[in-house]
Amino acid sequence: MEYRNVSRFSRRKFLFAGFVAAAGRPTTYAQQPAPIPETLTQWLAASAKMRELALQRCLNRIQTMEPSIHAWVQVSPQKNATRGRLSGIPYGVKDIIETRGLATEYGSPIYKGRIGTTDAAIIREMRKHGAILLGKTQTTAFAYLTPAPTRNPRDLDRTPGGSSSGSAAAVAAGMVPFAIGEQTRGSVLRPASFCGVTGFKPTYGLLSMEGVLPLSKSLDTLGFFTHTPADMSALWDSLGHSVGSSEDFDLGAPEPIPDVEPTMAAAYKNALSHLRNAGASIRPIDIAGKLAKLAEANLTVMLYEGSRFHKQRYDQYGNRLADLADLVRRGLQISADFYEEALRYIDSCRVQFAEQFKRTPVILTPAALGPAPAGLASTGDPRMNAPWTALGTPAASIPMPVGTALPLGLQLTAERGGEARVLRTAVRLQNMLGSQPI
């Protein structure tokens, strides 16, 4: 069906509902002896033949749905004969990441038609494990504010978030089982929350940023999108990182959270109550003030470093850089002393949170202020994610079960180096939350 032949309301509902129906449809051996995989966990368990069929279905979905969602800059499947755990499994990658022979346009019309001449380190890593690069996903311009044309598969009249807009939308729409993004403030965790998928960013510096367009050298971190926490855990394991087994410990959660919208406040409160009733030990912690100041420090660092990195580009293109031009002008007004003060505050908070993580090894917060904003003019507010990006801690956003309502994410973070703990806990909490609306 061509989406231009159905009503906007019907089209908006069909895009996501059709994928969910396919993913959750009960089957019998008489009906379908070998179901075509949907989630990454299913892909990993599938035969090579079933992976081929699933890849073709991904391409068919892109052909059908892309005119409405605009998740991609370019779709051009790259051959990969390497045998690995991800062999034959497709993925998308944010268009600030260099890819040899494919468009690398940074989300800006200035670089329209630019073709990458080298592969970023993360692309080489994926190739080593056998994954198939399907193409480049949309990003806000230079991974900053100017929105991409991407629409949220859960509601086409809303943003998918940013700056990793296309990667989140592509996974949410079932176009790929996983995708790569990048976060400087909240560019992975917030889109994951808005699109109802799982987002994850590891500890700052753990994954090489070689070949990724910088915005802030002290903050930029690669991240991933999958359908479920179990998929994310499987992806991390497939890349050679041990996840280990589940463990019991106290969780920390600030209650209430200032500034969140009523829908998020209610969902967050209900999620904590549901988890406590299911046996989780959750201790209230008083960190809201520190989180707000950390978000401000994150912004200061990003503006200062981003303005200096992009100064030469600004001198050449000026206001053609759109919102990035404003970043350069604002950032150049920040003194070195003020920048250093922000870095010192972040360092002091790392020490304080290291002690907090000894008491509550995983901290829970909302993954966004609320659901995805209406329209495409704004990709949403990153203040719930920016503190953890500043601290460089691993963090994940998992979907809270909210039924047919707009998606909302629950955010988890742990001490630096605690990727396995975050992922194990994410899987455990998702299982405890279940699928019934909270």
Predicted ranges, named:
Residues 1-9, 13:
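N-terminal secretory signal peptides
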Residues 18-23, 29-115, 142-144, 261, ...:
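Short, well-ordered alpha-helical
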Residues 33-37, 42-44, 97-100, 221, ...:
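Gly/Ser-rich, acidic/histidine-flanked active-site/gating loops
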Residues 53-55, 264-285, 311-316, 339-360:
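Acyltransferase
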Residues 58, 94, 126, 275, ...:
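Conserved hydrophobic/aromatic pocket- or pore-lining residues that grip, position, or stack substrates
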Residues 86-106, 300-354, 399-409:
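Short helix-loop capping/hinge segments that flank enzyme active sites or metal/cofactor-binding pockets
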Residues 88, 128, 132, 226, ...:
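Glycine-rich, small-residue loops and helix-cap segments
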Residues 118-236, 394-402, 406-411:
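Short glycine/serine-rich loop segments
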